[in-house]
Amino acid sequence: MQLTEHFSFEALIASDTAVRLGIDNRPPATLLPNLRALAEGLERVRAALGGRDLRINSGYRCLELNTRLGGAKKSRHMEGLAADILCPAFGSPLEVCRAIVAAGVQPDQVIHEFGKWCHVSFAAPGSAPRGELLTIASAARGYEAGLNPVG
């Protein structure tokens, strides 16, 4: 099912890890509005990155998948509102994170994660975005405010 011009329902729930572990990663129908909001947000991100294609490493995660991946207990991935993305044709994960903010995309949260990808989430329909900007370099160090280099 196509949610927006460039993002399908299937792309937002795809997980090689879920397939490998035999986990059913299909969301309940009640999360469809959130997945549509995520797809619309990702369209804004794509536009901010010059229309370049995004690589979605992780979108929606059911509780079991999120637990197996070591995700946060209140992860927006489980609500269908977050994606971990890369855009190699645009630049590094940090450059992607900063471009999202500079373009005024209005995400709920942007996290530069481990120097390896950009986590972007959007507010649920009818909710205001927090505009939270964070970096995590290691689990031991935890999150720090702002979008910072890792290394």
Predicted regions and their residues:
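Short, polar loop/linker segments at the starts of domains and inter-domain junctions
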Residues: 21-26, 71, 130-132
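A broad, low-specificity signal marking well-ordered, structured residues that form hydrophobic/aromatic
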Residues: 54, 83, 118
